Amino acid sequence: MSNLLRVAVSKQKRRYQKNGYDLDLAYITDNIVAMGFPSEKVEGVFRNPMKDVQRFLDQYHKDHFKVYNLCSERVYDHSKFYGRVGYYPFDDHNAPQFEMIDAFCRDVDAWMKEDSKNIAVIHCKAGKGRTGLMICCWLMYCGMWKNTEDSLRFYAALRTYNQKGVTIPSQIRYVGYFGRSIRESIKYVPRNVTLKKIVLRPLPKEINLSEVQFNISVGKNCVFNSKEHNMNVVISKKKKTVVDKNKKDPKKKLTKENSEKNIDSQQQQQSQSSLSQSQQGQSSPNMQSLSASGTISSGSNVGTVNGNTLHQLGGSQFSLSDLADGNTIGNDEYISFEIGALSLAGDIRIEFTNKQDDRMFMFWVNTSFVQQLEIIPKSGLDKAHKDKNHKAFPEDFHVELTFDQLDQQQSHTTVVASAEEQTNNQHYPQSSNNVATSSSHHDNITVVASDAPQNNNNNNNLNSSNSNNATTTTTKNNISLASSQSNPVQQESNPSTTTQVSEENSAPKVEAEKIENSNASANDSETSSNSSS
């Protein structure tokens, strides 16, 4: 029963199921292992039992393993792994501090160089997203892969059955950042920038924009909350006329939505009329425009600017503007939050919520990699990227971040790696049994990787010389994988998959297992997920 629970919890992740073990664990290379959290007590029933993980590592990699815990939400006594534990914590479904990635890679690098038998065992809670981010960065750090997308696809193929390895857009973006820093030999220095404006374009659906809120954090420290700051916020909406095709009279039949718009328009005209009689409002530097359908639920009118009514909500003001049909200049719908001048540096998280603080979407960016106009598409927004049917956000929805003029010299310092550093970075692909070659940057990737443990105690392979190899051919559309890690569920549903066990310590081999790449091609964030660059 416990084994069934573990398989259910691990979902599409590859498991180590041989030699008496059933662990949420996969060899990404000969010396890099990804696994789920080593758990105790009740949690050990459906996750990796701590005792089984200890026994596995002692049996196959005694004195030659170091465990890396990426969980910020849970820890364990480091003595359980003889004190050989690296701790690089960051929150689930979030990106790490950029400096932490480099520190992690240097730690693994130092450990690997101590002994050729040494392995790194890396885990978060599920052992997939955060774990994959760090492993993909390491694969580029050590020189095994140069391209971000190739590294992500390689990890996805070796860790999962459905090719969904690192799936959180912000985490993918940070793999891209790190890949760029490696390729361009960038010595990272946080850049100070000034955020001026955030634009959501087109307007999100199924939400009253008067309830849209957002906060901006540097790391975990919130530095701006829209609920506590007055802003100049503008909504631009198209005017639409609905015609009854039967009677051809636009006044005969209107949709509920447009009826509400007409009522709102009348209310605005009445408000403008009364205001013009009582007072003339002036343009305020702190305006706020917040309404999805033009409906103002509360507040009072304070004046007009360029023919648009200004409204008061709390301490803020906002304006509404309509775009006439056929307008060729700016003929789209958007909401613009003009923040003014917010100084930022380093890892930035921006989260949009509704009035009940339910998350709409969020994303992480690093100021050293942004453009002056940073455009993040829907596919690059955490949570919003899951809206495949475009119910909450239009298909072309995106976020625009406008920064003040950026000092490119301040962004980072470029250094040329020394001959010794270049040699060290080439150490792993040459010395490892894992060979990774890219025959075409965009078409085919052929990798040979081992998932079977080696008993470093007696320096003997547990398997025959070739039985532990997994050959993966990755194309733009699919991944063909021959792996020694078998999925019993898929074996039942795929009659073409065969498993052969030659002896007790031999790994079963799955021959020519075809796996559709349902994750398509991961977004290569090497250009900061920026469509403007």
Curated annotation (Swiss-Prot):
Gene3D superfamilies: 2.60.40.1110, Protein tyrosine phosphatase superfamily. InterPro entries: C2_domain_sf, Dual-spec_lipid-protein_phosph, Prot-tyrosine_phosphatase-like, PTP_PTEN, Tensin_C2-dom, Tensin_phosphatase, Tyr_Pase_AS, Tyr_Pase_dom. Residues 235-298, 410-533 are annotated as: Disordered. It is an enzyme of class 3 (hydrolase). Pfam families: PTEN_C2 (PF10409), Tc-R-P (PF22785). The keyword Cytoplasm applies. It is a peripheral membrane protein. It catalyses: a 1,2-diacyl-sn-glycero-3-phospho-(1D-myo-inositol-3,4,5-trisphosphate) + H2O = a 1,2-diacyl-sn-glycero-3-phospho-(1D-myo-inositol-4,5-bisphosphate) + phosphate; O-phospho-L-seryl-[protein] + H2O = L-seryl-[protein] + phosphate; O-phospho-L-threonyl-[protein] + H2O = L-threonyl-[protein] + phosphate; O-phospho-L-tyrosyl-[protein] + H2O = L-tyrosyl-[protein] + phosphate. Signal peptide: none annotated. Residues 265-298, 455-478, 517-533 have a biased composition (Low complexity). The keyword Transport does not apply. Residues 410-439, 479-505 have a biased composition (Polar residues). It is found in: Cell membrane; Cytoplasm; Cytoplasm, Cell cortex. GO terms for molecular function: inositol-1,3,4,5,6-pentakisphosphate 3-phosphatase activity; inositol-1,3,4,5-tetrakisphosphate 3-phosphatase activity; phosphatidylinositol-3,4,5-trisphosphate 3-phosphatase activity; phosphatidylinositol-3,4,5-trisphosphate 5-phosphatase activity; phosphatidylinositol-3,4-bisphosphate 3-phosphatase activity; phosphatidylinositol-3,5-bisphosphate binding; phosphatidylinositol-4,5-bisphosphate binding; protein serine/threonine phosphatase activity. Residues 271-406 form the C2 tensin-type domain. Disruption phenotype: Growth defect. Failure to aggregate. Slower migration. Leads to increased F-actin polymerization. Unable to suppress lateral pseudopod formation and turning. Having a direct on PI(3,4,5)P3/PI(3,4)P2 levels. Significant increase in chemoattractant-mediated activation of pkbA and a decrease in chemotaxis speed. GO terms for biological process: actin filament polymerization; adenylate cyclase-modulating G protein-coupled receptor signaling pathway; aggregation involved in sorocarp development; bleb assembly; cell motility; chemotaxis; chemotaxis to cAMP; establishment of cell polarity. PANTHER family: PHOSPHATASE WITH HOMOLOGY TO TENSIN (PTHR12305), PHOSPHATIDYLINOSITOL 3,4,5-TRISPHOSPHATE 3-PHOSPHATASE AND DUAL-SPECIFICITY PROTEIN PHOSPHATASE PTEN (PTHR12305:SF81). This is Phosphatidylinositol 3,4,5-trisphosphate 3-phosphatase and dual-specificity protein phosphatase PTEN.
